From Swiss-Prot:
Protein name: Elongation factor P
Organism: Janthinobacterium sp. (strain Marseille) (Minibacterium massiliensis)
Function, as annotated: Involved in peptide bond synthesis. Stimulates efficient translation and peptide-bond synthesis on native or reconstituted 70S ribosomes in vitro. Probably functions indirectly by altering the affinity of the ribosome for aminoacyl-tRNA, thus increasing their reactivity as acceptors for peptidyl transferase.
Cellular component annotations (GO), alphabetically ordered: cytoplasm
Xref: InterPro entries: Elong-fact-P_C (IPR015365), NA-bd_OB-fold (IPR012340), Rib_uL2_dom2 (IPR014722), Transl_elong_fac_P/YeiP (IPR020599), Transl_elong_KOW-like (IPR013185), Transl_elong_P/YeiP_cen (IPR001059), Transl_elongation_fac_P (IPR011768), Translation_prot_SH3-like_sf (IPR008991)
Keywords carried by this UniProt record: Cytoplasm, Elongation factor, Protein biosynthesis
Record gene name: efp
Sequence similarity: Belongs to the elongation factor P family.
Amino acid sequence: MKPAKEIRVGNIIMVDSKPMIVLRSDVNGSSRTGFTYKWKMKNLLTNTPMENVFRGDDKFDVVVLDKKPVTYSYFADPLYVFMDEEYNQYEIEEENLGDALHYLKDGMECEAVFYDGKAISVELPITIARQVVYSEPAVKGNTSGNVLKEAKIENAVEAHRHTVQVPLFVSQDDVIEIDTRTNEYKRVVRN
């Protein structure tokens, strides 16, 4: 058990018998009156957000989640199916995947996150390479400063086709590297 004052953003704790990830932490108070911690959290099982205020000496169980390398296999409406190297299949609900939906591609390797023996989400590699499937051509004379345009990238599910801001020189069919944490263009990948 850890006191609230030792819990950091990104820690997974049990609140009312539910696993919650701490997304943001604001501290108020003084050493004389005692500190309070206002946390913005997300339930790992239902993806519902929650905000709550705790005293610095409130204690919480810290949860360590299991992770296992898996490969994205297919979409079986409304579940996404992943397979490990032993051909075990894990089904994850669409709402639990979050932004990972934008980058999933058949055969993509990632890590499944398990809580209590059940796959609850996936973690993607930090950077991935994706082909640009549509991008407006650059307009001549539109080159002053850091000018960006939208580019649609390939992924497994057409309904979740995603756009990324890219420089003007990026064109359709280019392969670009993207940071999955920030959804930012990194560079053009040369083959």
